Amino acid sequence: MSRPVVVFEYGSGNVHSAVKALEAAGADVELTRDRRRAQEADGLVVPGVGAFAAVVDRLRAAHGDEIIERRLAGGRPVLGICVGMQVMFERGTEHGQETAGLGEWPGAVEPLCAGVVPHVGWNAVEAPADSVLFDGVWDERFYFVHSYAAQHWTLEATGPFPKPRVSWAEHGSRFVAAVENGPLSATQFHPEKSGSAGLRLLANWIGSL
């Protein structure tokens, strides 16, 4: 049976490709900003494109920060995509301006240290051997479009959850490509634009709900 998944519609970018990919991966998908529906779904997907500060502002205006916090407190899965991953960190720095994120993870999102920015294209991802998301797609490449990333990871095991599984990619220097941390997972790349590998990754997440 399909698992009910909400893609949170809060005004950040084109979410329809995420909806279609999640449906193709086996989810029963609803696109909504309704707080009750977002809270009750088996899984919540938080996409995001554009500037860190603008995404944070839109999320908060739609009470997305409260929804995410309540879901995580109850152990209910959340998946962030691209800037939807970035805003889970404590802060983001763009054009010299620092903006507070949602603070689910310590650390900062900063400009990529690369000669060519933005980073647009397909990259390999170095995932831990016990990753659930990357099961079956260890050697695949995923599609990235970004100029900023978290380039350090400091969080270890917290509370009842095991040590986070952190995956890495490289563009100029290493950066965090994906995180699996209890009920909160996220990808810097776009699984919905990553072909069959992205669909398998989404199916792995759906299967874990």
From Swiss-Prot:
Q: Which GO terms describe its biological process?
A: L-histidine biosynthetic process
Q: Active site annotated at which positions?
A: C82 (nucleophile), H190, E192
Q: Name one GO molecular function term.
A: imidazoleglycerol-phosphate synthase activity
Recorded hits in CDD domains, A to Z, give: GATase1_IGP_Synthase
Q: Which gene encodes it?
A: hisH
Per the UniProt record, the source organism is Leifsonia xyli subsp. xyli (strain CTCB07)
Question: What EC number(s) does the entry state?
Answer: 4.3.2.10, 3.5.1.2
Pfam families, per the entry: GATase
Q: What does this protein do?
A: IGPS catalyzes the conversion of PRFAR and glutamine to IGP, AICAR and glutamate. The HisH subunit catalyzes the hydrolysis of glutamine to glutamate and ammonia as part of the synthesis of IGP and AICAR. The resulting ammonia molecule is channeled to the active site of HisF.
Protein name per Swiss-Prot or TrEMBL: Imidazole glycerol phosphate synthase subunit HisH
